[in-house]
């Protein structure tokens, strides 16, 4: 896999990182629209959410969104040395497997990430920027998938 274009990623992330909760909410709203079967995986204090809107307004889920955006931020920060995050990302993969997330769902997460970036950046979300983010996300998922494989 080619290395992602670091400057395109950093530049585009600057706009997103100004409002991580807002943009993270767009990402998860899109995720639940594309793959509604993921909603039951998110339970806090044994509480099942009745709708994506119910989940997206929950303080516990908003905390999850913040954490996801921090992981993306770490990937952006380390875009030129993602190997420094390998162990952390594999551990994150194991945690997601343990709560019932299927590895195949990360394809939908990737689509949702690109959707959020496009909504946030508008015309600045060029084909080159999309390609750079796709490469970065692919590398992150590859590292996380080691948590499924038990490596």
UniProtKB/Swiss-Prot annotation:
It comes from the Eukaryota. Its EC number is 1.7.-.-. Changing residue 64 to L/Q: Increased nitrite reductase activity. Disulfide bonds join 46-55. Changing residue 46 to A: Decreased nitrite reductase activity. Predominantly expressed in brain, the strongest expression is seen in the frontal lobe, the subthalamic nucleus and the thalamus. The keyword Heme applies. GO terms for biological process: cellular response to hypoxia; oxygen transport; response to hypoxia. Heme b binds at residues 64, 96. Its main location: cytoplasm. Changing residue 17 to A: No effect on interaction with 14-3-3 proteins. It catalyses: Fe(III)-heme b-[protein] + nitric oxide + H2O = Fe(II)-heme b-[protein] + nitrite + 2 H(+). This is Neuroglobin. It comes from Homo sapiens. The lineage of its organism: Eukaryota, Metazoa, Chordata, Craniata, Vertebrata.
């Amino acid at each position: 896999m080619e290395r992602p274009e670091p400057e395109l990623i950093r530049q585009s992330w600057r706009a997103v990182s100004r409002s991580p909760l807002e943009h993270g909410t767009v990402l998860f709203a899109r995720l639940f629209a594309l793959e509604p079967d993921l909603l039951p995986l998110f339970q806090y204090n044994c509480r099942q959410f009745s709708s994506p809107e119910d989940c997206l307004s929950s303080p516990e889920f908003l905390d999850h969104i913040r954490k996801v955006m921090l992981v993306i931020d770490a990937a952006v920060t380390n875009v030129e040395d993602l190997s420094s995050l390998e162990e952390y990302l594999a551990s994150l993969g194991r945690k997601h497997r343990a709560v019932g997330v299927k590895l195949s769902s990360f394809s939908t997460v990737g689509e949702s990430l690109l959707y959020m970036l496009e909504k946030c950046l508008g015309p600045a979300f060029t084909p080159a920027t999309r390609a750079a983010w796709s490469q970065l996300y692919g590398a992150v998922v590859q590292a996380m998938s080691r948590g499924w494989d038990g490596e």
